[in-house]
């Protein structure tokens, strides 16, 4: 295995789907070609692989994929690895419902897709809905090309991204202030009412508990008064008990201390009750009701105090709102000027290097037997990437009218540029029938492009022609035996026979084998 940081799928196991009763394949890095007669289950195999990543519905009772992804951060999902090169295992079990697991940790399908997002890049017939060849990608490629040519370009892009992000934040804050300004009078009235409601209460941390205690005392003060008075009367004569104990030679110090403490506690409670005599029960209940409402509205007295501070701050800010708006306006205008200047500098670089990039794109397209495409810079609303967009021109064609084969080859041309200048794709390429309906010459061109891409990414490609299997590092054959679909990785001798079958079927088998050996260089 090559020592690189890209994802690599090392194994696929499938149990009981519509085609395969049992499937167990091990994969190596590089290009893996998948071939076989029509209807044996090649696309079903690819669908099972995509199903493990949540990109298709699971088509089997059990799918298991082993992969190595050193850069993937799994700790956030409770999956810890001692070694980042330790294989991860995705399991998909389908019974009444479909369940997803990563290293035996259960995850929802959406969570799994979010974690593995971007690890699988697929070229298929629904490519236009994916909008892969968009102006963001093309502009990123041009910028990557310029960065490779001129080191002064990257600082400009970084500075623009930082300043534009700050500009957007300030504009959002200014809009929020302006909204407040439009409703300033109404907002001030509501905040002042809330401030008055909170300030007229004594928002002490223990105030609610203190009032509850007062309510309890008031409701039972007469009974408590009688009990305390009776107890204090009894304590008046306890000296007779302690004197008698001392007379017969026993110490009464402990009892004296306890009786003194009991007397002090009762006198303290009696003082509380006397204080209650001065309380207005209606006012206590009224304030208690208000505090209950505050706790219900704000969660606690502490939260109400925090809210009071926030309300006061908001009222202060409303008084300063005109000043703040003016400050925001000046800062926004300053940042706009700086961003526009950076956009002009970036635009200058793009115009200078566009011809060279177009020449490179044309060369890639020519290698893939396509008419030369060209990219044209047009003005666009300012963003963190500048104030331009790239528009793809295809001589006498429109992108939407390209055949599936033409589009796939054009996408390959851009992939080759991505590999060279962006180097940020660390996933696996899955190509579904890439060479179907292509001429032999076109298929040969595609195989060369895939061979180049496979030095950077693992690739799985269903193939109907000999050129992709001939350059593939691994060749997987899907076939039927006793009416059951099977799949296996071919050795060199088996590869020769399969490529010979693809060339000429059962006719001219000797010349087909000779040609297959020549293609495989064996």
From Swiss-Prot:
It comes from Helicobacter pylori (strain J99 / ATCC 700824). This is DNA repair protein RecN. May be involved in recombinational repair of damaged DNA. It comes from the Bacteria. Signal peptide: none annotated. Coiled coil: none annotated. ATP binds at residues 36-43. PANTHER family: DNA REPAIR PROTEIN RECN. One of its GO terms (molecular function) is ATP binding. The gene is recN. InterPro entries: DNA_recomb/repair_RecN, P-loop_NTPase, RecF/RecN/SMC_N. GO terms for biological process: DNA recombination; DNA repair; SOS response.
């Amino acid at each position: 295995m090559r020592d690189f940081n890209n994802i690599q799928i090392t194994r696929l196991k499938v149990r009981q789907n519509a085609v395969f009763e049992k499937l167990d394949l091990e994969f190596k890095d590089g290009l893996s070609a998948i071939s076989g007669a029509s209807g044996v289950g090649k696309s079903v195999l690819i669908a099972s692989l995509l199903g493990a990543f949540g990109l298709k519905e699971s088509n089997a009772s059990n799918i298991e994929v082993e992969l190595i992804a050193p850069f993937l951060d799994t700790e956030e999902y409770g999956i810890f690895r001692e070694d980042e090169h330790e294989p991860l295992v995705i399991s998909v079990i389908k019974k009444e419902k479909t369940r997803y697991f990563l290293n035996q940790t259960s995850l929802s399908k959406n969570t799994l897709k979010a974690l593995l997002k971007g690890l699988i890049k697929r070229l298929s017939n629904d490519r236009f809905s994916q909008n892969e060849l968009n102006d963001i990608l093309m502009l990123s490629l041009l910028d990557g090309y310029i960065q490779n040519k001129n080191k002064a370009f990257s600082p400009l892009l970084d500075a623009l991204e930082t300043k534009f992000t700050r500009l957007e934040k300030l504009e959002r804050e200014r809009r929020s202030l302006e909204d407040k300004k439009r409703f300033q009078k109404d907002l001030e009235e509501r905040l002042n009412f809330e401030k008055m409601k909170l300030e007229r209460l004594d928002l002490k941390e223990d105030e609610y508990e203190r009032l509850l205690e007062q309510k309890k005392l008031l409701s039972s003060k007469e009974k408590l008064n009688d009990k305390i008075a009776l107890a204090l009367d009894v304590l008046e004569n306890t000296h007779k008990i302690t004197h008698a104990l001392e007379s017969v030679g026993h110490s009464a110090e402990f009892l004296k201390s306890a009786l003194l403490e009991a007397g002090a506690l009762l006198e303290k409670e009696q003082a509380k009750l006397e204080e209650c005599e001065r309380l207005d029960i209606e006012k206590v209940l009224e304030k208690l009701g208000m505090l209950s409402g505050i706790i219900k509205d704000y969660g606690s007295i502490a939260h109400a105090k925090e809210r009071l501070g926030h309300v006061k701050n908001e009222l202060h800010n409303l008084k300063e709102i005109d000043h703040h708006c003016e400050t925001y306006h000046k800062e926004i205008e300053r940042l706009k000027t700086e961003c526009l200047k950076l956009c002009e500098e970036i635009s200058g670089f793009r115009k200078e290097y566009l011809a060279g990039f177009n020449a490179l794109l044309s060369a890639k397209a020519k290698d893939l037997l396509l008419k030369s495409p060209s990219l044209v810079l047009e003005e666009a609303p300012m963003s963190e990437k500048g104030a331009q967009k790239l528009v793809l021109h295809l001589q006498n064609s429109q992108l939407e009218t390209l055949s599936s084969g033409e589009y796939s080859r054009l996408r390959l041309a851009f992939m080759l540029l991505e590999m060279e200048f962006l180097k940020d794709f660390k996933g696996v390429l899955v190509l579904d029938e890439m060479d179907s309906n292509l001429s032999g010459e076109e298929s040969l061109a595609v195989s060369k492009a895939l061979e180049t891409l496979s030095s950077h990414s693992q690739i799985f490609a269903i193939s109907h022609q000999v050129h992709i299997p001939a350059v593939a590092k691994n060749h997987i054959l899907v076939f039927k035996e006793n009416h059951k679909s099977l799949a296996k990785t071919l050795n060199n001798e088996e590869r020769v026979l399969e490529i010979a079958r693809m060339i000429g079927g059962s006719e001219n088998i000797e010349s087909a084998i000779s040609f297959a050996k020549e293609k495989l260089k064996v």
